[in-house]
Regions:
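Short, flexible segments with low predicted structural confidence
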Residues: 371, 378-379, 483-484, 491, ...
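Helix-loop-beta element that forms the nucleotide-linked donor phosphate-binding surface
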Residues: 447, 494-496
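Glycine-rich phosphate/ribose-binding loops and adjacent secondary-structure elements
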Residues: 90-240, 250, 255, 259-261, ...
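Flexible, charged surface loops at secondary-structure boundaries
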Residues: 453-456, 546, 753-754
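Flexible, glycine-rich loop/tail regions that form catalytic "lids" or insertion modules at the edges
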Residues: 1-108, 117-121, 125-128, 179-180, ...
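Mobile "lid/hinge" segments at catalytic clefts and subdomain interfaces of large enzymes
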Residues: 187, 196-199, 224, 228, ...
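Broad structural signal for hydrophobic residues in well-ordered alpha-helices, predominantly aliphatic
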Residues: 407, 519-520, 670
Length: 756
């Protein structure tokens, strides 16, 4: 599941500028915070205004500040701020608009003028600058508010005047919590989402909201505050004053020159667009709005609804989704019938899309064909595959057991997820196949983690973060906790079970090393894996994890994950698995650590071309309703409701068929590439090339879309570290178990243990 829509830079639709950014988060090296249960240490209180220039000699000039309980201002509060009559409190509004007719040149000119006007305002003694797009009209489009505030913020820093004023954004663009977080993170002191307030007022007047306006407004602000707490907590930050201006985001699909000029950084993993495309998209959205207004006037009919484009659910003529009714139906039919030709049809739909959705859709393989008989058999290839971690509790008993049966039959591995496993499954077989999952997960809640659980594992996975919602932890609602799940998790039926965002015994690499050591002592024969989430800097974290003696590292991509993830996290947290695994591989090779660890990756891997994990649920009957947390899954896959579980029509043979089809397709690709084993291509990025666009690309997708795609640069992604070093795992970690007291006691008691 997860986010299966295109990145902003890959979309053929005009994008708001916020969509090019992703949240960063803490993992391993420092802990995330539980913003709900540790709310006592969280604060959105701000003091905004001029900071006196002589901070070592404090006087009344340091006191020209306004205390805000939170940074979300109402229209009334902004009006009060604009009209403060106290001496030394001066406010000015600067328009953030540009001339539509001038395009990119107009946007660039407007940004330059805005920065100089802001500096001049500071020199004139204005300690509150309001950046407002209320002056938008048919000839003037709004400058993206994030671009405007970041440009002014960094310009004032460069001239040494930033602390002499507060920057307040008054914009109709602000709607979601991510928008607010980005504006604050790039320098805004406070925000006023006036358009949202206007929409709330209209909804109340039309009876669409059964509250008065004051209550609706307060509820909206409360939701934004909770969201800001959540986003700050992901990074382990407890106060907005530490978060403001910290730039704890990463841009995906923006050019280095743009980031250097307006955002104070030049790090861009895959390159991307500049002012030309930003201006073009802003003008498109502007023109659409005014065309609609013109049509309303001419027809006398007021448009009450915007089109439902299907950000999360597939809609005809809406946003493109990798999982759509056609791909889901074809895959399910192929696995039920055991029809490989039908699977190839599904793979063609997934791989040969009309337009790219993922970064890997731009890549192709170099070919040097050999006879397929020279390539290792499917039965060997399939053992490289694992399923994603999906807990018993999130999934129904039937679905969870079907995954284990299929993977055990294939000699591959299923994963328990964080909910433990019924101990009866360790010793139970069905059709001669064990029901026990080979990979046992240890998450922050430690549900179901016992010595018996750990000793029955071939791999023990420490889940530090989850791709679809890193830094957030999880919760199994009480209505899904029935008697068997409560027994498995050592809890009480009907009680919600909470996994906190951090492991409270892992606040550093050293703490992780201790947990790995402890788990290895419980089960010396099990491999210890650590699950991380793709983000900028994950390579450095992975290097520390290898030094902490992990045997395996999972890099989880933002596109994978769970149907129970918060919508905002699904869209805006984490990055593509291609970027995360590339950085991890390069960092480990460069530091001579790659030979000590195996790497896995997950996130929308659906075909032999993608290879590996997340499609296993689809083959069991999932129809992507994205209601996993609501206990209302109509297919009986992700529910504990007995009536709905009776609808489950999945069978472990379907999962077997899927993975064998996947292995067969991988084998065919290996033959085309000229390699005999899957291990032979690990780390060899020189085998990947960028696909050429078809000759009629501009005609099919429009020149604007082609310009976006051509702005991408995958050289960092495909960089291969040189030197005499291994590109895959060739050694076994030394877990330093010799001489441990446990071992001495076991040896001393060996005779008594064996004799009973």
């Amino acid at each position: 599941m997860g986010n299966d829509t295109p990145l902003a830079v890959l979309s053929d639709r005009p994008q708001i500028f916020f969509n090019y950014f992703r949240q960063q988060f803490a993992q391993v090296t420092n802990p995330a915070i539980d913003s709900i249960r540790e709310n006592l240490v969280m604060s959105l209180t701000e003091y905004i205004g001029r900071v006196g220039t002589g901070i070592l000699n404090p006087n009344e000039s340091n006191c020209k500040m306004v205390r805000l309980p939170h940074p979300i201002l109402t229209n009334t509060q902004l009006d009060i701020l604009c009209n403060i009559r106290y001496k030394g409190f001066n406010t000015i509004k600067l328009p953030i608009v540009f001339e539509v007719s001038k395009g990119k040149a107009g946007l660039q000119e407007a940004l330059e003028n805005l920065c100089h006007d802001a500096e001049h305002s500071v020199d004139e003694g204005y300690n509150y600058i309001i950046l407002s797009d209320r002056s938008v009209d048919e000839e003037h489009a709004a400058i993206p508010s994030l671009l405007a505030v970041s440009a002014v913020h960094h310009y004032l820093i460069s001239v040494g005047k930033r602390v002499q004023t507060a920057l307040i954004v008054e914009s109709g663009e602000i709607r979601e919590v991510m928008h607010a977080a980005l504006l604050l993170g790039y320098g805004a002191s406070a925000l006023c989402p006036y358009m949202t307030y206007a929409i709330l007022d209209d909804l109340v007047k039309r009876g669409k909201i059964q509250e008065n306006y004051a209550t609706a407004e307060a509820n909206y602000i409360k939701a934004l505050k909770k969201g800001l707490f959540k986003i700050m907590a992901k990074m382990g930050i407890s106060t907005i004053r530490s978060y403001r201006g910290a730039k704890i985001f990463e841009a995906i699909g923006l050019s280095e020159s743009l980031l250097k000029t307006y955002f104070g950084t030049d790090t861009s993993t895959i390159g991307g667009i500049g002012l030309t495309t930003i201006a073009r998209d802003a003008i498109k959205l502007h023109d659409q709005a005014f065309a609609m207004e013109k049509e309303e006037k001419e027809s006398g009919h007021k448009f009450m609804f915007l089109p439902a484009l299907g950000q999360f659910h597939w809609r005809k003529d809406g946003i493109r989704h990798a999982w759509n009714p056609e791909t889901i139906a074809t895959l399910q039919l192929a696995t039920r019938k055991g029809d490989y030709e039908l699977f190839k049809k599904y793979a063609a739909m997934a791989d040969e899309k009309d337009e790219p959705i993922f970064i890997r859709d731009f890549l192709d393989f170099k070919r040097n064909p050999i006879d397929i008989s020279e390539v290792e058999p499917e039965e060997s290839i399939v053992k490289h595959f694992v399923t994603g971690a999906m807990s018993f509790g999130a999934l129904s008993k039937e679905a969870h057991e079907a995954m284990a049966l299929a993977m055990n039959y294939l000699g591959a591995r299923s994963n328990t997820g964080e909910g433990g496993e019924d101990s009866e499954r360790y010793y139970t077989k069905r059709d001669g196949i064990s029901l026990s999952s080979k990979t046992k997960q240890v998450a922050s809640g430690r549900f179901g983690v016992t010595t018996e659980y750990l000793v029955n594992a071939e791999e023990i996975q420490i889940k530090v973060a989850q791709g679809a919602k890193p830094g957030e932890g999880g919760q199994l609602p009480g209505f899904k906790v029935n008697e068997i799940i409560a027994k498995t998790r050592h809890s009480i039926p009907g009680i919600s079970l909470i996994s906190p965002p951090p492991h409270h015994d892992i606040y550093s690499i050293e703490d992780l090393k201790q947990l790995i050591f402890d788990l290895k002592n419980v089960n010396p024969n099990a491999a210890i894996s650590v699950k991380l989430v793709a983000e900028s800097g994950v390579g450095t974290i992975a290097a520390g994890v290898v030094k902490a003696k992990a045997d395996l590292i999972v890099i989880s991509g933002a596109e994978g994950g769970t149907g129970a993830s918060p919508a905002s996290s699904m869209r805006f947290a984490g990055i593509s698995p291609e970027i995360g695994i590339a950085e991890t591989q390069q960092t480990l090779v460069k530091n001579g650590l790659r030979s000590l660890v195996r790497l896995q990756v997950d996130g929308q891997m659906k075909t032999g071309r993608d290879v590996i994990m997340t499609a296993a649920l689809i083959t069991l009957g999932c129809v992507m309703m994205r209601k996993c947390s609501a206990n209302t899954c109509p297919m009986g896959v992700a529910t504990q409701d007995p009536k709905l579980r009776a609808h489950f029509r999945g069978d472990y043979h379907y999962v077997i068929n899927f993975f064998m089809f996947l292995a067969r397709e991988v084998r065919e690709y290996l033959a085309q590439m000229g390699y005999k084993k899957l291990d032979d291509i690990i780390g060899h990025t020189e085998l990947l090339t960028r696909k050429a666009l078809p000759a009629d690309a501009a005609q099919r997708w429009g020149q604007a879309t082609i310009d976006k795609w051509n702005s991408l640069d995958f050289s960092n992604l495909l960089h291969k570290e040189s030197g005499d070093t291994s590109y895959f795992c060739t050694k076994v970690q030394d877990h330093e178990l010799d001489g441990v007291l446990d071992e001495q006691m076991i040896k001393a008691a060996a005779n008594a243990i064996e004799s009973g």
